[in-house]
């Protein structure tokens, strides 16, 4: 998902639409090869002709597929095709930009979960939601630390404290307090 990852592997960093189209075909290939019969697909990125993938997965339907992203198209696709949907910053150009940072707010995360819910329809309750935690800090001084973290990310302290991607824990407290943020540690639904 990052341009540096693709550069290090010699891959071309295609535009987001091409990467999403390739992922959709890739998921179709995996699911097809995990099926009981020979599988064929004539796509723009993959061509499979009467291949019966072996060995077959032990788990019916194959292992769970996780698809993560931060944009509407990839999250909507994930909601329709994946078993686990990862809700992440919107990294359009393969770099963590100021816009990507802003897409980690509580409000942006709620909007993304709405896209997933809308696209998933009746299967929403069967999908596992995963949210990337970018910052975990154990401190008794969360307000001061949130100002410092927020300043480095172009966000104010209140936005950092409310963000589901940043969690706060107080040292030497019971475990029930070890994973809560300003919004009570709940993922917005």
Question: Where are the model-predicted features located?
Answer:
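Active-site-adjacent structural elements that line small-molecule/cofactor binding pockets in enzymes
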Residues: 1-189
């Amino acid at each position: 998902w990052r341009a540096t990852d693709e550069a290090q592997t010699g891959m071309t960093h295609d535009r987001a639409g091409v990467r999403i189209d390739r992922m959709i075909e890739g998921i179709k290939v995996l699911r097809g090869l995990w099926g009981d019969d020979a599988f064929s697909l004539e796509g723009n990125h993959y061509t499979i002709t009467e291949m019966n993938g072996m060995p077959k997965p032990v788990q019916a339907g194959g292992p769970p597929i996780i698809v993560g992203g931060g944009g509407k198209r990839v999250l909507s696709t994930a909601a329709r095709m994946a078993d686990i949907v990862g809700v992440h910053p919107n990294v359009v150009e393969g770099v963590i930009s100021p816009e990507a940072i802003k897409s980690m707010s509580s409000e942006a995360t709620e909007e993304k979960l709405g896209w997933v819910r809308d696209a998933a329809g009746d299967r929403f309750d069967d999908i596992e939601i995963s949210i990337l935690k970018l910052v975990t800090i154990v401190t008794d001084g969360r307000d001061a630390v949130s100002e410092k973290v927020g300043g480095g990310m172009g966000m104010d302290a209140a936005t950092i404290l409310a963000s589901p991607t940043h969690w706060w824990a107080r040292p030497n407290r019971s475990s029930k307090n070890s994973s809560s943020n300003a919004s009570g540690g709940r993922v917005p639904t």
